[in-house]
Amino acid sequence: VDLSKYKVLSKVGGALMVGNVKNIPTALVRTGKNSYQGLDLRCTHQQLTSKLVSGTYRCPAHGSEFTKTGAVKVGPAEFGLNKINTEVVGKTVILG
């Protein structure tokens, strides 16, 4: 992900729906000054793709909600979204 192309990632807490990475629906979240976290957007309850709505990832099936960093906010999901490794190289974040 070229950081210079996405203003939403210029601030800590910014989140970008990246699309599919290795067939996994993926988001990228800025978690610190120079740190980013990839998230697998498949709900840990029934594997449907969660969508970012008003700063919260929501599953369309049963209403599970997750924070921007993937922690469970509202069930029925019992586990947070799975993390995807990231590596920052210059102004690019490599996912996976």
Question: How would you label these PLM feature ranges?
Answer:
Residues 65, 69:
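Extracellular/periplasmic metallocenter environments
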